[in-house]
């Protein structure tokens, strides 16, 4: 894997900087590294493809070295270099695609394609290593079963979940009280509602709670908390739990009271925030508990009082909500996040070449299913294919 990254980094630098008119002295280090790569690769043969519709291709290496000059690089020099660079880039692209289409239930962190296994051989260690990539650094740690750490921005840590629970209901669905939520990606939105606006509740207050368990623990997370759940702020028709009917939800938004957010790790409370909104931090957690209250306003203008009558029909439904968004965090496991295209790159290659469903990944690389059942085997394989996708993205956009 380190060799694959180092070759790609060398090719990227060469493609960007070996241009006509450049002084040789300005790129001599790159050219020397480029020549070392050629010397190491010459005389070797590789084969890629042969899975799904990814075609089998054979690769041979027999390239001349780039020479030295005291002058600027001329068109002939650059053209010779470009021919070699383009062949190597095509090779790296196919090695990466081959690797991204393969999976294994055992030791999925290790190279799975024949080409990458061969590149892991001792003879290729002469290629100048560049391990500056976060993915390469973590791949090395994971390969040795040491603790890894990925920095994510808006990590897709929450499997998609959208539903509701009713604490009070009737066959006519005309006086309901309960909770509805939408968890997806890096965001939780949860709303508590009461058609009667807590009129018959103790102290005219309804208590709501929403607990979310993460599939992987996060550390040093920066989080935004807002006293609103905008996705539940407009009327909608909702299917009943048994699917036999539908019911009408027409929210009127109130501010939540006594808001408390707890972050827990293995059942132990690590951080607690009460009535605090905006940016907060959480040190280490695998569970989030949100609790909040809906309180019937003790004083109301006639217009507000008309919204919340003391008897049916209840045409407007008192609603309070919270939004929790994970803006950034560190995780020991690889995840998809908003700043990267690794999941899209891997999925696109597997779809384009009709890769059959294997023993590890779900059909279509369905992220909700993948993160819901995030086994050690999936973690190993995902880290490997994301590492390869990050290498490929240096050369192929």
UniProtKB/Swiss-Prot annotation:
Record keyword Zinc present: yes
Compartments, as annotated in UniProt: Virion
UniProt: Zn(2+) binding residues: 153
Stored InterPro entries: Capsid_hemagglutn, Rotavirus_A/C_VP6, Virus_capsid_a-hlx_vir
Gene Ontology MF, one: host cell surface receptor binding
Post-translational modification: The N-terminus is blocked. Sumoylated with SUMO1 and SUMO2. Sumoylation of viral proteins seems to have a positive role on viral replication.
Binding site for Ca(2+): 266, 286
Region (Interaction with the inner capsid protein VP2): 62-73
Main location: virion
Keywords, in A-Z order: Calcium, Capsid protein, Intermediate capsid protein, Metal-binding, Ubl conjugation, Virion, Zinc
Function noted in UniProt: Intermediate capsid protein that self assembles to form an icosahedral capsid with a T=13 symmetry, which consists of 230 trimers of VP6, with channels at each of its five-fold vertices. This capsid constitutes the middle concentric layer of the viral mature particle. The innermost VP2 capsid and the intermediate VP6 capsid remain intact following cell entry to protect the dsRNA from degradation and to prevent unfavorable antiviral responses in the host cell during all the replication cycle of the virus.
UniProt name for this protein: Intermediate capsid protein VP6
Naturally occurring in which organism (per UniProt): Rotavirus A (isolate RVA/Equine/Japan/HO-5/1980/G3P[X])
Lineage of the species this protein comes from: Viruses, Riboviria, Orthornavirae, Duplornaviricota, Resentoviricetes
């Amino acid at each position: 894997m380190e060799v694959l990254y180092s070759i790609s980094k060398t090719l990227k630098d060469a493609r960007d900087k070996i241009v006509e008119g450049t002084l040789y002295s300005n790129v001599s280090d790159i050219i020397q590294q480029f020549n070392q790569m050629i010397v190491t690769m010459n005389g070797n043969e590789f084969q890629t493809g042969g899975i799904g519709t990814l075609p089998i291709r054979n690769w041979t290496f027999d390239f001349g070295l780039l020479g030295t000059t005291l002058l600027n690089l001329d068109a002939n020099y650059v053209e010779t270099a470009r021919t070699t660079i383009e062949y190597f880039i095509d090779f790296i692209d196919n090695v990466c695609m081959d690797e991204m289409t393969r999976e294994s239930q055992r030791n999925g962190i290790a190279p799975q394609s024949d080409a990458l296994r061969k590149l892991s051989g001792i003879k290729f260690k002469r290629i100048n290593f560049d391990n500056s990539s976060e993915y390469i650094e973590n791949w090395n740690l994971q390969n040795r079963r040491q603790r890894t750490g990925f920095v994510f921005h808006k990590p897709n840590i929450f499997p998609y979940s959208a539903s509701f629970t009713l604490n009070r209901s009737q066959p006519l669905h005309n006086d309901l009280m309960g909770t509805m939520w939408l968890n997806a990606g890096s965001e939780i939105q949860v709303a508590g509602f009461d058609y009667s606006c807590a009129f018959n509740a103790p102290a005219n207050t309804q208590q709501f709670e929403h607990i979310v368990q993460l599939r992987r623990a996060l550390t040093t997370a920066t989080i935004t908390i807002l006293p609103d759940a905008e996705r539940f702020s407009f009327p909608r028709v909702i299917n009943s739990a048994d699917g036999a009917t539908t019911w009408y939800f027409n929210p009127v938004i109130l501010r939540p009271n006594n808001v408390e957010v707890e972050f827990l790790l293995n059942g132990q409370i690590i951080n607690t925030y009460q009535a605090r909104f905006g940016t907060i931090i959480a040190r280490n957690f695998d569970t989030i508990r949100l609790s909040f209250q809906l309180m019937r306003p003790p004083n109301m203008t006639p217009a507000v009082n008309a919204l919340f009558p003391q008897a049916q029909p209840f045409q407007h439904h008192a609603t309070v909500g919270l939004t929790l968004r994970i803006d950034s965090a560190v995780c020991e496991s690889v995840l998809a996040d908003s700043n990267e295209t690794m999941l899209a790159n891997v999925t696109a290659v597997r779809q384009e070449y009709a890769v059959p469903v294997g023993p590890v990944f779900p059909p279509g690389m369905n992220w909700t299913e993948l993160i819901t059942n995030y086994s050690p085997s999936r973690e190993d394989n995902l880290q490997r294919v994301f590492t390869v996708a990050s290498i490929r993205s240096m050369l192929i956009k």
